[in-house]
Amino acid sequence: MEMKDFREMPYARPDLEEYGKQARKAARRLREANSYAEAREACFEQQRLENEIGTLYAIASVRNTIDTRDAFYEEEIRYLQEGLARMTPIEKEAMEALAGSPFRKDFEKEFGAQLLKETDTSLKTTDERLIPDRIREGELCQAYQKETALAVIPFRGVECNFYGLLKHMESTDRMERKEAFRAWAELYARISPKLDAQYDELVQLRTRMANTLGFPSYPEMAYLQRGHYDYTQADTAAFRKQIREIVTPAVAELRERQRVRLGLDRLCYYDEALLFAEGNANPEGTTEELVAKAQQMYQEMSAETGEFFNFMVKYHLFDLETRPGKRMGGYMTSFADYQAPFIFSNFNGTSADVDVLTHEAGHAFQGYLAMRSIPVSALTGSTAEINETHSMSMEHFAYP
């Protein structure tokens, strides 16, 4: 598909009924294939259909998170989440056709064992009995996202959202820091009844989903959904133990050094964000200037990173500044049909803005390369844990 500026990427509600018919037809072709060539062609037709829907979903999702107040994209996300959940039987049919294909070993030989391992695992957590709960799960996640995005509070004459308070939380004025943290807490206190109700329902819903599929609790199901084939709950428990025994004492030592640097008798929770008595090292310049400096850095880093970031800038594949109604946090996503990553963030005038241009860019660089070198879309991503090696590595590469 011809590349377009993100602001000009077209979105039209997809015909999910027609998508279902075509997906079922591709699954049947895969199941009835008489040769590996036929099976392979059917598999890639299925991928083409999924990428087409996935690209539209990603465009709608990004635009929804940019402004959660936009009624059009809010409704589109609701339509897509519900419609795709109802496609579960067709989704499972396609996976069963691949997993049970007589040409399974041919697929593994060409694309590696991971593709079929992921398919086999997904089959364990895909069931049409979960359709109502999957729909409700999507609704709850959207509601939580919107609730936090719309939260604002007056602070020193300015109406601030969560990200608007962050710079004040780093102030060299201790009272300002304390007031900012209390405003942050007050923001959460105001919306906590709704957030608590949403979270409670989500816990019960996910437990019910897991029990329906025969899992004793949600974590067992979630580990499979997240691609943790070898990394078990026992490994997580061992990691928590290491955090408590090794990392926590090291952090306590760093906090003590910070207390001394700040000249405080006691380091309080509202002091932790200020690293130096003279103030934190915050970025100078506008968003456009920061992006231009990042572009220069990536061009100097390597030919590959330069090409990648030039692509991001040329097609405006960012939405960086915090604003009213914008979802909290930061993320990288991708538009498969365009082989294009996208970076979402909430710039707020702190060093975190620079972190975004390295951390999220690390995710985006991995996606940019993977979409151009790996023919199977399902293999262009990884688990959340492995993905962080891409982002954190880029942070280290970018250090002076």
Language model: regions and residue ranges:
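Short, hydrophobic/aliphatic alpha-helical segments
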Residues: 195-207, 312-316, 342, 372
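A well-structured
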Residues: 1-284, 293
